[in-house]
Amino acid sequence: LKACKLDERALSTLPPGRFLMPGDLDGSPALTFAPLPALAERRPRPGSLQAMMERRYEAYKTHVVKPFFREHITRLDRQIVLIDAMQALNAGPAAMADLERAVTEILACFRPGRGNFLTDLFSRRIDRILVAATKADHLHHESHDRLQAIVRRLADRAVARANFTGADVDVVALAAVRATREGTVKQGRETLPVIIGTPLKGERINGDTFDGKTETAIFPGDLPDKVDTVFDPSVTSPDGGDPAIRFVRFRPPKLERTAEGVTLSLPHIRLDRALQFLIGDHLA
């Protein structure tokens, strides 16, 4: 699961989630089960490996998954689903298709009347869901509309596949903390829109590795006009090498203070719009 999550594959459908983020269950037998090869459809023999795997999986659902939903999710009537579209775009169409699959499965968990062990726990109806593509600051604002169009297409297909109804679903490209600023760079007769920030140590573009200290102007590339392009496995980079779009991770900005010593809030992108959609009606 950890290998599948790395940038090379950037997969998103990676349950059980606690295997990647064990928290207080780190080292617990509750996280020591695995799928087995196809076996005959009969009850496992007592004391067998199959019986132990089945018992631990059922215990995981009972003691880890259900309490999480019962204590947290079931009390919500608004939900925000954060997706790392940038990482998936870096990895290509297969990662984008898997991201769509993950969003579908998430929405299916919120679908009323589905009749599985999760949705039977719901006592409240979720009436607004925001699908938010994070790290919008890794793109120039000229590409934000295209990013939102990609996420809209992904969300619409996920809603249809999950047969999800009864809630308003919106999308937004945002950055809770803006780690870059924008600028332009002359390249011959062409003026390129760039983002300026400090890439994390070890991030790479075209063979160059960043040291985590140097501020750099980066042209991440343009997202395609046609949304379906990023989901089409037949589309590759023109020369078969690095992709036409490439994003790196940036260090957060330094906190700034006024002359009076007051610490300023961190900059963001569209966090206000996200809050307006999720809770604006409660504040009117």
Whereabouts are the PLM-identified features?
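Short secondary-structure boundary/capping segments
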Residues: M96-A97, D145-V151, K186-L192
